[in-house]
């Protein structure tokens, strides 16, 4: 993932629903394997993780234009994260947004939210199977 304890990223297009927020930091969480993606002004934060932590065969088919938008030409620059949804009434009912992953260029410190073209992924993929 991203090795540093806390690192800042520019999101020129913002995040869907939060287009006006352009700067985020990603920092370690005490709840591994999750990290916290927090806006610099601390108004908004998301719980994120690598989708490969719970779905090793994840193939989102991210468009090359999306990677180009954040200047991530090489594989070693690219990181894929997903936003996690925790449901208050049932902590085992944790879902991940696999339909709109966060993509990061970890060298240029740029990010965006992409739309996955693989139809088998949803906005609410169950992280823990029963």
From Swiss-Prot:
UniProt-annotated location(s): Cytoplasm
Q: Which UniProt keywords apply?
A: Bacterial flagellum biogenesis, Chaperone, Cytoplasm, Translation regulation
Q: Does the keyword Phosphoprotein apply?
A: no
Q: Which Pfam families match?
A: FliW
Keyword Plastid appears in the UniProt entry: no
Mention one GO biological process in which this protein takes part, according to its record.
Answer: regulation of translation
Name the predominant localization: cytoplasm
Q: One GO CC annotation, please?
A: cytoplasm
The protein's superkingdom reads Bacteria
Q: Which family does it belong to?
A: Belongs to the FliW family.
**Partners and quaternary state?**
Interacts with translational regulator CsrA and flagellin(s).
Its biological purpose: Acts as an anti-CsrA protein, binds CsrA and prevents it from repressing translation of its target genes, one of which is flagellin. Binds to flagellin and participates in the assembly of the flagellum.
Protein name in UniProt: Flagellar assembly factor FliW
From which organism does this entry originate?
A: Borrelia garinii subsp. bavariensis (strain ATCC BAA-2496 / DSM 23469 / PBi) (Borreliella bavariensis)
Upper lineage: Bacteria, Pseudomonadati, Spirochaetota, Spirochaetia, Spirochaetales
């Amino acid at each position: 993932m991203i090795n540093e304890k806390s690192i800042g990223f520019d999101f020129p297009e913002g995040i869907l629903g939060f287009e006006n927020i352009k700067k985020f930091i990603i920092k370690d969480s005490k709840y591994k394997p999750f990290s916290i993606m927090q806006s610099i002004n601390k108004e908004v934060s998301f719980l994120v993780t690598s989708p490969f932590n719970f779905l090793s065969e994840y193939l989102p088919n991210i468009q090359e234009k999306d990677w180009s938008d954040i200047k991530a030409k090489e594989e070693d620059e690219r990181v894929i994260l997903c936003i996690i949804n925790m449901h208050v009434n049932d902590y085992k009912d944790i879902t991940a947004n696999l339909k709109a992953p966060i993509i990061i260029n970890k060298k240029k410190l740029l990010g965006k939210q992409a739309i996955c073209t693989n139809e088998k992924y949803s906005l609410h993929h169950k992280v823990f199977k029963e």
